[in-house]
Curated annotation (Swiss-Prot):
Protein name, per record: Neurotrophic factor BDNF precursor form
Oligomeric form and interacting partners: Monomers and homodimers. Binds to NTRK2/TRKB. Can form heterodimers with other neurotrophin family members, such as NTF3 and NTF4 (in vitro), but the physiological relevance of this is not clear. BDNF precursor form: interacts with the heterodimer formed by NGFR and SORCS2. Mature BDNF has much lower affinity for the heterodimer formed by NGFR and SORCS2.
Glycan attachment positions: N123
Signal peptide: 1-18
One Gene Ontology term from the biological process aspect of the record: negative regulation of neuron apoptotic process
Gene this protein is translated from: Bdnf
Organism (species): Rattus norvegicus (Rat)
InterPro entries listed in its UniProt record: Brain-der_neurotrophic_factor (IPR020430), Cystine-knot_cytokine (IPR029034), Nerve_growth_factor-like (IPR020408), Nerve_growth_factor-rel (IPR002072), Nerve_growth_factor_CS (IPR019846)
Job description of the protein: Important signaling molecule that activates signaling cascades downstream of NTRK2. During development, promotes the survival and differentiation of selected neuronal populations of the peripheral and central nervous systems. Participates in axonal growth, pathfinding and in the modulation of dendritic growth and morphology. Major regulator of synaptic transmission and plasticity at adult synapses in many regions of the CNS.
Length: 249
């Protein structure tokens, strides 16, 4: 499982040319180039030009990516909006990638969460693991959702943290050219079995509906005054069930 996870991370970094790490000015204009952009990119960039020829052990790979992961998590904490100034700070999430091609995997933090769950269960007996498997217990999601990478060409516009409508720029200038902005969106599946209501809800007593909810991510945008800068914008990030009680019965 460890080797599989590392393989997924390697492929993830292979397609990623750059990733936004810091927010110089949430609402401000700032530089077009994202501040402190890091390219962890390939094994060569992490371990030196001869890394590919001399090979790496599983242990050294694990140590390297553990260090990268710690940096990502530390930076993620630094760029979160001040909760005193932003009521929706708890809705912040990172689902943006700058790349020259469509990413092949979900965001890295999603893979980390799955790997963490695996590590938490690593010491359990086979019997416990077998009974804890959601598929074996017949667990189903209350609402059916779909997740996919979309580009700024698909989004066009978005709402920022001040409530204004901004234009989402499709490409971001970097030192060696331009990269596209990709957003990993999750929304309710219009073709799913829960389009008429949430799964498992007693319809005799409750009205239910699956709704797409949004969170904030950082993106390069342009406001109505043609000012370009990095801002927090809303994108679709989950599908939740809302309930209202039936009255008059």
């Amino acid at each position: 499982m460890t080797i599989l996870f590392l393989t997924m991370v390697i492929s993830y970094f292979g397609c990623m040319k750059a990733a936004p790490m810091k927010e110089a000015n949430v609402h401000g204009q700032g530089n077009l180039a994202y501040p402190a952009v890091r390219t962890h990119g390939t094994l060569e960039s992490v371990n030196g030009p001869r890394a590919g020829s001399r090979g790496l052990t599983t242990t050294s790979l694990a140590d390297t990516f553990e260090h990268v992961i710690e940096e990502l998590l530390d930076e993620d904490q630094k760029v979160r909006p001040n909760e005193e100034n932003h009521k929706d700070a708890d809705l912040y999430t990172s689902r943006v990638m700058l790349s020259s091609q469509v990413p092949l995997e979900p965001p890295l933090l999603f893979l980390l969460e799955e790997y963490k769950n695996y590590l938490d269960a690593a010491n359990m007996s086979m019997r416990v693991r077998r009974h804890s498997d959601p598929a074996r217990r017949g667990e189903l999601s209350v609402c059916d959702s779909i997740s996919e990478w979309v580009t700024a060409a698909d989004k066009k516009t978005a709402v920022d943290m001040s409530g204004g409508t901004v234009t989402v720029l499709e490409k971001v200038p970097v030192s060696k050219g331009q990269l596209k902005q990709y957003f990993y969106e999750t929304k309710c599946n219009p073709m799913g079995y829960t389009k008429e209501g949430c799964r498992g809800i007693d319809k005799r007593h409750w009205n239910s509906q699956c709704r797409t909810t949004q969170s904030y991510v950082r993106a390069l945008t342009m406001d109505s005054k043609k000012r370009i800068g990095w801002r927090f914008i809303r994108i679709d990030t989950s599908c939740v069930c809302t309930l209202t009680i039936k009255r008059g019965r």
